[in-house]
Each structure stands twice: as structure tokens, then as C-alpha cells.
Amino acid sequence: SPVQKEIDFKNIKNIDCFVCHDVSGKYRKNGANGGMPADGVDMKLVSASIGRPSKTNCGACHFYSGGGPNIKHGDLEPQLANSNSGLDIHMGMANMRCQDCHKTSSHQIAGRSFMAPVTEGRVDCETCHGETPHGITGVLSKHLDDHVRTVSCETCHIPSFAKETPTRLSVDFSQAGQDRTPKMDVNGMPDYDKRWGAITWGKNVVPVYKWYNGTRKSYILGDSMASTDNVDLNTPIGEKHIPGSRIYPFKVHTAMQPYDTEKNVLLPVKFRDGYWKDFNWDTAIKEGVKASGMEYSGKYGFVKTQMYSSIHHEVVPAVKALGCADCHKVEAISCRRCHKKAEGMDQPIHTQMVYPDVKNRIDFKALGYEDDPAFIGGRFYLQLGRGKPPK
């Protein structure tokens, strides 16, 4: 927007200290006015109420990104500010602050969203828990630690997200602009908004699992689309044969959004004081294109896009983490398949699903396996030259 163009992000005087350091809870910003303090804020009170950032400070932006509570990320909902251990073990039982993980030096905050264009100062579970977090006791400890080389901690320890506040899963802009009454879904969320179009929501959402090596391929405004069937806006890069790749959980958000049918590129749209003013796509696209410096053929359509958001918050207690049978076939879970003298090692708990209502959680074929790797061999066997596991 024109206001954003005028902001010099390198000028330290443009940093709003109160957003992070106000502890009165009374500070508010005016998003429509370049982020200036909202009218009516008692600046004397706020100026006298300065302290370390709390979860509420961080959440003032991150809990509401996307235009409302938990809309964008899915694993950052307002309840985390006063969490219980069932919602998030770190912020709940341990009462950790955001900066306990997102270490900060000279106001440089480690860790960024998967949707951000760059990542500086990666935040990893291993920083605190190490590479062998399951201990040396217990029959399964070594096997669980073996999984860490292939499966991210979040995959097992965040079985679902958006546990209390629904998150948006899709939006169809092609249906926007209609005067129709929205219906409420099972979570009490509207299935339509004139500004956005048709909307779907999810609660207790099971993630999508993808290989990821810490890099991604992002669509840059102006890039020509290879296909108009399904456009990935930020694809996680990784594969079972690529070193450093591990299986991570993701939220996937899909949309039907405008694109130039002649140039085959996605189109920027001016919404505020643009489309939302008269609901004319052509005019709003022309204004968006002009502001971005792109060219527009004058012909537009709608294309399906999908955006990935990595899941890192809402970690459950260890007893609620995924069990063997939540991912693998029950018939593959037997110690004696490999340990021939493992009398008494097989326990009923090994084949019990912690989340029996979730079927086919892991799509092994989508991850590049012909079948369950517990049967045909995964990294545990193939990389160590063991061949295929016994049947």
C-alpha cells in the first residue's frame, strides 16, 4: 500500500518499542494508519509500563495474523497466552515465554515463519533436547532416537493443531462479492464472507506430512506458472534420498485466486479501498498491478493455489505423542521380527493407537515409499546396508 512504501525499515526510529515491551495491556495500533498508535491510547500509562515481552505481546501480532485469531498459522492461537499442558506443554506446564526458544540478541529474533522469504537463526528442538532425547532406558528408546534422523520431533509430538480456535483451510476468491447469507459450520465459523468468498475452517486438524531439508521453493510475484492446475506458493524441498531431509508436519491452505490468463502469472489485488469498495475485480487488479509495477493483459481468471505453513507449536505431553501404530501397520510392529530372542519384549501398548479415530495418518506413497517402510525398509535399514527388514 502507499503507506508501506513510505516506511524506511532501516530507520531505527520507525521501530515501535511499545508493541513488544508494553506490559499494561492497554496499547493498541491503528493498522489502517501505518501502524501509528490508535486513538484514545493513554501514552503516559503505556510509557510507564515497560517490561520484558510476554506471550501476549508476541501474540498481539502472531496470534491474529491473517486477519483474525489463528487464521493463518493454525498452531498459534490466542489461548497459548494462558495455556494448559494439553494445549502446549512448553507454554502451559513449563510456562515458557516465546523468547525461551526464539533466542534474541541485539533485537535479532531467531526463527521465522515458513512463509517468510528468508530464515535467519533457525530454531530447533535439538537445541534443548539434544539428538538423543528419548533417554537410554526403556525398550523403545534407541528405536525412537533412530527415528529422529528421519522424522522431526514435531511430527510425533504435535498430532494436531488448531485445538481450540479453528484455523482457515481454504478461501475461494472467485465466489467473493455475492450478497448471500453465510452459514455456520460445525465449529461455529462462517462459510462465506463477501470480501473473501467461500471459506472452509478446521479444528483439531491433522497435519500433512512432507519431506523437508530446511529449504523451500517460493513463487515470486511475476513468475510464470508452469501449470494452472495447482500452483504451489512455497513448496518444502526434501526427499528420502536427500541428506538432511526429515518428515515434518504442515498446514496446507488452498485458495482460488486471480491470475492473468494471457501472461500466466498471479495477479496482485488492491483490496482495501479497492475491491472491497465496489467488488469489481478488474478495477482492483489494475490498481494492484499499477502499485506493484507489473503489466496486465486485461484478462483474468482464477487458479487454485496452495500454501504450506510449518507446524511447531502446540506440543503435547510425551504420553500423548504418536505411538507406533498411529503411523505404521500393526502387523509390522513386533520386536521379534528382528530380535529373535526378544521374549517378553512385545507389549500390547506397542500396537495400540494413541489416536484411533485418525486413519491413514501417514501417506507413505506420497513420501516416496511403495509401502510401509517398517515392511520394505526405510533409512534405518537401507542406509546402514542391512537390506530389507525380516518379515
Regions found by a protein language model. Name each.
Residues F161-K391:
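Long, charged, low-complexity terminal extensions
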Residues S1-S174, G298-K391:
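Inter-heme linker and motif-flanking segments adjacent to c-type heme-binding CXXCH motifs
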